[in-house]
């Protein structure tokens, strides 16, 4: 028995191609949140229909950070990363939180 999957493009507009970004699911608001990567330190949300850029201000640009959802506080937590992907000595140790409206 084999399965056949059919993919459908849901949105024509969204984040530019990138790598080194972080992405996590925000359960309280049922959104996928994408931050940063190689291109820009911007924040995007996917609501199962469309991508929306939601924040221009926030953590400085970085690659390879980690982001998880804290269910008890209903916030996304972003940690670390590097300023230059080819220079791990430029590692960051800061922590940021996304509450669905702004980074702090």
Predicted regions and their residues:
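Kelch-like beta-propeller repeat domains
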Residues: 1-104
